[in-house]
Amino acid sequence: MSGTRAYNILVLPGDGIGPEVMAEAIKVLRTFNSSSMQFHLQEELIGGISIDTHGHSVTQPVKDAAVAADAVLFAAVGGSKVDHIRRGLDGPEGGLLQVRKAMDIYANLRPCSVDVPSREIARDFSPFRQEVIEGVDFVVVRENCGGAYFGKKVEEENYAMDEWGYSTTEIQRIARLAAELALRHDPPWPVISLDKANVLASSRLWRRVVENTISVEYPQVKLVHQLADSASLIMATDPRVLNGVILADNTFGDMLSDQAGSLIGTLGVLPSASLDGLPHPGKQEKVRGLYEPTHGSAPTIAGKNIANPTAMILCVSLMFRYSFNMENEARQIEDAVRAVLDRGLRTPDLGGNSSTQEFGDAVVAALQGKY
């Protein structure tokens, strides 16, 4: 069809509640199909279900499909019968690590704002006093392809070791992305870089390269170096101090982004994006990305139609924003989710009695102006 923009998306539902929440995200995505925009979906196996079917947490054809796709939607893995005997890259979670590595999506972004998905959710579920979390607005930018998670490993009966290495090139590219993201705000957000330069050699290199890269190439961006453990304390006591772009390596970024979920009160509503760059504002271009909720596979509630699809639906919003440079559509989804939550339609984890499908249907109705 002439003038139709086509987007090829790889869909990886995975294990546990993954297929259920993914179905609702796809339902939302399909509402944007039109004469000018079409989404072509390819669904494949990953995680425990892939091990059960193929003997591997992810197959080479799936990794190839991820590299070829314009974007990847991933739900959850784990909770399978092989979890206790298959670990690392051989286990269910290893499939996701392999896909990230194959795609070279080196930057993981986890936004944290009291306004997304809903101020009402933060008010009702955050364990923090409202005056502590009021105004919290930051994004954790985590290096996604290096560090301890991908380094050499030794695991013996009485000794184990994880190599925690980084190169200058790996640090430079994530520092540049963090600075570019900071510049998208007016005035520019600060970049708060986390490390343990007082004890770790890799962190000393991290601090030096981040300093040299941002101070020279992005002088208009304020750069703050913060020890990671100190940042964790700040996040628990005065989180607005961290407003801006929090830049961290794979390990510290993983920890701090999960802690950020406690400010909102639940990981069940928070999406994340893993990218190989950022789109240029105002241009019709595609950036390779993988989008996943921050929650797990929740096998104890799988198949019961009670899982919360909010985070998975918001992954579609992030995909529109970062892979397809479609800010208006991204905001439409966020506004629709907020409208549904603020009117009290919630799944059991948020104190409601709505089903997974009912929540997805309500978001679609809100997008269509019928809610």
Curated annotation (Swiss-Prot):
Stored NCBIfam families: leuB
InterPro entries tied to this protein: IsoCit/isopropylmalate_DH_CS, IsoPropMal-DH-like_dom, Isopropylmalate_DH
Source organism per UniProt: Aspergillus niger
A Pfam family per the record: Iso_dh
Major subcellular location class: cytoplasm
GO MF annotations, alphabetized: 3-isopropylmalate dehydrogenase activity; magnesium ion binding; NAD binding
SMART domains in the record: Iso_dh
GO biological process, one term: L-leucine biosynthetic process
Keywords in alphabetical order: Amino-acid biosynthesis, Branched-chain amino acid biosynthesis, Cytoplasm, Leucine biosynthesis, Magnesium, Manganese, Metal-binding, NAD, Oxidoreductase
Gene designation: leu2B
Site, as annotated: Important for catalysis: Y149, K196
Family listed: Belongs to the isocitrate and isopropylmalate dehydrogenases family.
Name of the molecule in the record: 3-isopropylmalate dehydrogenase B
Subcellular localization(s) per the UniProt record: Cytoplasm
CC per GO annotation: cytosol
